[in-house]
Amino acid sequence: LSHRTKEDRDVEDPHLPIARYLRERREAAGLTRVALSAQAGISPALIQKIEQGSRTPTLEALTALFDALDVPALFRDHLVSLSLADRYGSPAADIPSDIPTADLVLLNSISYPASLQMYTTYDVVATNSAWTRYFPGLDTSTTLLEWMLLDPRSREVMLDWDKQVHLCVYGFRVMSPGVVPKERIDRLFAACAVAEEWERFWTTEPDVPSHLDRPVQRIRHPETGAAVAMTMQVHDSIVPRREWSLVTFCPLLDGSSRDAANQ
């Protein structure tokens, strides 16, 4: 699946994904609008308008609904940014054709697995040598979603494959509308839907961490085969501004994990 051509800029109204997520979250919790109203302190009529996408929710209303529905921090931040998209946001950028040399020098100076990625399309735009060793095949020719679902090596590398892929697929479903062009979403959906787990991952909510302070994943060491517990960190550049994020995997700071990762 090629993803380097310029995308059609037909992006969904950013308020509709907010409406859809809140409605699905309420229904999954088994709450009526009246019951949610009692918990959130918002009238049922306003909840209905927000869920229909006919009323843009204020930050106060969103916060009240998030608290009442126990929305994970990962999705809270994204939905708040979507609510401001018509004033401050912009659609997902095209894949850059050239990465500045300074960015590549920084990337290659990191001894642990690191890559530059575009969110929320999971495009990989550059990798270092450690990334290539730990995640074979996950390079600029594919996306993280396609690699996880379609490349058999991902199931060997990711020791918590089901949990992590479920979270990524559901995150793509929630966070791409309103940001990523619909044509691009449809193409990624079609490419990944051949995986037998796709429907379950797409239609059911995963066990999302309540906080994001220590996202730990177990990765198989490429040489020894040992399980290495690593924290994934996503770094956004403020100066200079960049359209991509620096994604790194670092071993936990206990001696056994550090020694295994450094072998």
Where are these regions (language model features)?
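Short alpha-helical DNA-recognition segment
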Residues: A28-K49
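Residue-level signal for the short linker/turn that defines the boundary of a DNA-recognition helix
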Residues: R20, G30-L31, P57-E60
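Short, positively charged
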Residues: V11, Y88-L104, E197
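Short amphipathic recognition helices of helix-turn-helix/homeodomain-type DNA-binding modules
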Residues: L1-T5, E60-D98
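A short, Lys/Arg-rich alpha-helix, primarily the initiator
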Residues: L1-A28
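Hydrophobic protein-protein interaction segments
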Residues: T101-L253
